[in-house]
Amino acid sequence: MIFGSRRRIRGRRGRSGPMTRGLSALSRAVAVAWRRSLQLRVVALTLGLSLAVILALGFVLTSQVTNRVLDIKVRAAIDQIERARTTVSGIVNGEETRSLDSSLQLARNTLTSKTDPASGAGLAGAFDAVLMVPGDGPRAASTAGPVDQVPNALRGFVKAGQAAYQYATVQTEGFSGPALIIGTPTLSRVANLELYLIFPLASEQATITLVRGTMATGGLVLLVLLAGIALLVSRQVVVPVRSASRIAERFAEGHLSERMPVRGEDDMARLAVSFNDMAESLSRQIAQLEEFGNLQRRFTSDVSHELRTPLTTVRMAADLIYDHSADLDPTLRRSTELMVSELDRFETLLNDLLEISRHDAGVAELSVEAVDLRTTVNNALGNVGHLAEEAGIELLVDLPAEQVIAEVDARRVERILRNLIANAIDHAEHKPVRIRMAADEDTVAVTVRDYGVGLRPGEEKLVFSRFWRSDPSRVRRSGGTGLGLAISVEDARLHQGRLEAWGEPGEGACFRLTLPMVRGHKVTTSPLPMKPIPQPVLQPVAQPNPQPMPPEYKERQRPREHAEWSG
């Protein structure tokens, strides 16, 4: 028996599961529709408020009608019982030869016979009569009619000499249901004679039920009409708003000629006119900005190309002088070194301007080949390693033991890494810089982590802006132009990859480059976290299969050979 009951309970739960899920899905759908549909909210609120008003009004009107009907019934009953008391007094005082019970029964029969319509029924309608003389000592009480239907509270008032009435539910031979019972003491030769009239409220109840039904039907019809009116009225407002939303979306997509139709002179028409004026102004400004941007890019490209030829000539002359600087006096030798250094910086600026103009014009192209990215990282380290040695900064390198083959433009990826490492050295505050690489089936990631000044909130986006610097007064050992990270993020996007930054003041910063292993694939996740371990390991990370460090990594080179790649 126990196991059987468990199976039944489990079956009931199994059947309730789909119902619960269905109700949950329905509630979510209703919640979504409520949040997204202004028309639904307007109609629902209109129906809710209208329903509250109709219920309140219906309650008040029903109460008024009920009280009015019952008041008429009570006044008619009072008139009826006054006439009945006179009739009873006449019958009881008429013949002394009749017994008390006979007199009471005769009086009751006389009263009830008057309720026949043919004999002139009272205004209060049909009723039943109860006559009673309470017992006194050894004498028993004398009654006529259904005395047990008279409430004790009402009998107490009548016994005290007061006329009173009360609503009660009675059950007699000819009627069962709510009734009005009115009682009064009667003056006659029989002391303490009490008269009660029972008036059925069937017709009044039917009238009240009819009124309530009529009001409910009218309220329902009115509610439906109000819903339709609210739907139509809200549609007059929602349709133009939806049209404006669709046109705004198309405008945001680049369809600058989209405009709202103007109909009439009402508020919606003024909204359409204002929207069209705004769209016209925005389209003009966008066109002007696009034209200005094109001119700016063309100017940058033209200037960069025009300066290339004289710069090459000056470079050749400077190199010739530099090669014979040993024969010059110290002052001229130092001037030659400064001239070569500034030419390196100027050439780097031209190269960066040319590269950023290619990205702006959309003509930058990838030269994709399958390469081992570990070699690319080592090449980048070899080109900027001398900056770390000069600053006394330790580079901690953690590369996979196996090859990491990816389809990338090795030149652009190496440039990204050089910019990131040089930027980390500039901001490391003589603390170690960690370079890590990891790969999975789809993506490869390289992080460059420093433990220096870090980034303030919001600067992780600004750091990729052109010519932006967190602290303009900081001395940059890499001699960057301010375009390195801007070019790097464009190179990463060209690979359909991501270049992201994270930092906290005083905790350092981390730049993460994530690239797809296969050209054309999109990056969705990264094998390396954005937030590295906050405390650096001061010893170099031991590689499972250490690779020999390129000789140029320790060799101090001329600054101009690396200035092109500094950020």
From Swiss-Prot:
Superkingdom per UniProt: Bacteria
Keyword Nucleotide-binding: yes
Membrane topology field: Multi-pass membrane protein
Cofactor(s) the protein requires to work: Mg(2+); Ca(2+)
Domain Histidine kinase span(s) in chain numbering: 302-519
Molecular function per GO: ATP binding; phosphorelay sensor kinase activity
Consequence of gene disruption: Not essential for growth in liquid culture.
Protein name per its UniProtKB record: Sensor histidine kinase MtrB
Organism the protein comes from: Mycobacterium tuberculosis (strain ATCC 25618 / H37Rv)
Taxonomic lineage: Bacteria, Bacillati, Actinomycetota, Actinomycetes, Mycobacteriales
